[in-house]
């Protein structure tokens, strides 16, 4: 397999899947399709406290109540950090947000069932109590409504699990994916599968430790922030990303990789969730209280700047080696390839200037671990370096559309494998794509006048690291084909839609 948050919302970044929509779970069978929840007869009332979050991205969030919270206290909701933070900013790998105001337009829509839309309950988000994408991808939001007000309306928090689900045991996710569903079905859905294992993952800028893995079906953009529940309907994790829309093993956005020995592996069609068992230990009378029993990183952190792009090549366009340029104040550090290093182990941290030598030459993912002296070893700042010198092998798809004046075309992006294009065209007779001068595609459709048909179109893809693939040729005739789809609408062979970042990141 050649190289590739939930909603991160926006996250934008169109990728398309090259995998089958069916995938085997740990029991050897296939996960059940998700079910649209209906509540006209209160059959799903226990999930009325799960809803559509409209914040920095469109996600899922759910009511979560600290122990001892007073009835008059403002209610809280849980979701992913990437649903409220500017996740395209690399500072999210070390920034911790505590007690920040929320946009006046943000809201959580509860009672979010397809058959009782008139009973929906929109609640304004008052503040961001906590948000992080460092080590964990979680956010705690304060609502304008109190616990007493919500519970009087039949909106109750999900019960908190005291232990994580065991591998092989049944679980379920409840969320509001947008995905491929028609608008009338973009409401709460339940998907069932089994808990598989715990793994640490790397995705683009971020590293997340000890996530829960499952194969529940129909996890799409909008699913970010969905609760993951055990057989007793107790929440133990929060869904944050999926490889179901991944197209390569580059560990890029939308292509999470598991950190194994040696190196990273993208396992197709897997979902990953943040553990929240022990989250109650982070609150004292609904006030944040960081400590050794709290599984959230505190605001004391190591910031850095001047990190390499992801992915990158170890040399520049002229073939000159690239060097480490990362800068961080008062940091101890260590560096190594995924599988060879554990950033959470205090051993081997160096008390010397940060590296300035050449980047490693071998393809793979490397971690530069940063810590402060005597800091909590559970939550290092991690700078991800992804090196890739492999040319993309995917053949670009063209979107064609005809008019009385001729034919226009544009290549279809599949980030990160096909992030840039070089294009050209000439007469079908006598044009060789190997010798034709190609120019950068500027994201403006290219027109071929009907007088120049039939024509030969030549396209070369370039991946996000700057590696160019083979040149492909496409012959276009003067006759309009019987079926040419509108621009940017040509489907994948798999029938799946491009991933947007809700990361479910499209996400």
Feature map (PLM): residue ranges:
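Bacterial N-terminal signal peptides
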Residues: 7-14
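Positively charged n-region of N-terminal signal peptides that target proteins for export
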Residues: 1-4
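Protease-domain processing segments flanking chymotrypsin-fold serine proteases, especially trypsin-like
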Residues: 15-73, 94, 281, 285-297
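Generic structural signal for well-ordered beta-strand positions
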Residues: 64, 236-237, 469
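Low-complexity, disordered linker/stalk regions enriched in Pro/Thr/Ser/Gly
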Residues: 287-507
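Serine endopeptidase catalytic core focused on the charge-relay Asp
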Residues: 25-27, 45-57, 66, 71-74, ...
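C-terminal subregion of chymotrypsin/trypsin-like serine protease catalytic domains
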Residues: 81, 100, 209-210, 218-220, ...
């Amino acid at each position: 397999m050649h190289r590739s948050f939930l909603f991160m919302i926006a996250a934008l970044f169109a990728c398309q899947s090259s995998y089958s929509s069916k995938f085997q779970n740990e029991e050897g069978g296939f996960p059940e399709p998700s079910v649209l929840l209906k509540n006209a007869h209160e059959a799903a009332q226990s999930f009325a406290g799960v809803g559509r979050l409209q914040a920095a991205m469109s996600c899922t969030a759910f009511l979560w109540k600290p122990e001892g919270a007073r009835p008059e206290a403002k209610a809280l909701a849980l979701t992913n950090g990437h649903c409220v933070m500017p996740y395209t900013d690399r500072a999210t790998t070390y920034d911790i947000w505590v007690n920040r105001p929320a946009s006046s337009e943000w809201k959580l829509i509860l009672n979010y069932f397809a058959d009782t839309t008139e009973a929906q309950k929109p609640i304004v988000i008052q503040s961001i109590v906590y948000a992080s994408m460092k080590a964990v991808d979680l956010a705690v939001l304060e609502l304008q409504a109190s616990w007493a007000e919500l519970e009087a309306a039949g909106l109750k928090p999900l019960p908190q699990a005291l232990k994580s689900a065991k591998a092989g045991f049944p679980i379920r996710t409840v969320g509001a994916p947008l995905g491929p569903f028609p608008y009338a079905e973009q409401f709460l859905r339940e998907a069932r599968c089994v808990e598989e294992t715990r793994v640490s993952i790397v995705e683009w800028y971020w590293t997340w430790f000890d996530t829960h893995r499952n194969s529940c079906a129909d996890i799409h953009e909008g699913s970010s922030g969905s609760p993951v529940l055990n057989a007793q309907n107790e929440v133990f994790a929060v869904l944050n990303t999926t490889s179901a829309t991944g197209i390569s093993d580059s560990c890029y956005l939308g292509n999470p990789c598991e950190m194994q020995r040696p190196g990273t592996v993208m396992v197709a069609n897997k979902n990953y969730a943040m553990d929240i068992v022990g989250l109650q230990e982070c609150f004292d009378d609904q006030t944040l209280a960081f400590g050794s029993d709290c599984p959230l990183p505190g605001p004391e952190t190591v910031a850095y700047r001047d990190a390499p792009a992801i992915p990158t090549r170890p040399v520049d366009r002229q073939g000159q080696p690239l060097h480490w340029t990362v800068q961080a104040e008062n940091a101890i550090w260590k560096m190594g390839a995924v599988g060879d290093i554990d950033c959470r182990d205090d051993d081997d941290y160096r008390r010397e200037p940060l590296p300035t030598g050449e980047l490693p030459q071998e393809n793979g993912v490397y971690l530069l671990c940063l810590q402060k002296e005597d800091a909590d070893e559970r939550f290092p700042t991690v700078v991800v370096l992804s090196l890739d010198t492999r040319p993309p092998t995917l053949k670009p798809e063209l979107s064609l559309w005809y008019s009385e004046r001729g034919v226009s075309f544009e290549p279809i992006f599949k980030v990160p494998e096909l992030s840039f294009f070089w294009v050209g065209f000439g007469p079908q007779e006598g044009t060789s794509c190997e010798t034709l001068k190609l120019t950068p595609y500027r994201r403006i459709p290219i027109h071929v006048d009907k007088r120049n048909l039939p024509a030969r179109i030549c396209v070369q893809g370039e991946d996000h690291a700057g590696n160019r693939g083979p040149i492909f040729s496409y012959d276009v005739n003067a006759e309009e084909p019987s079926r040419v789809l509108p621009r940017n609408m040509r489907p994948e062979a798999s029938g799946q839609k491009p991933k947007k970042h809700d990361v479910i990141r499209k996400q």
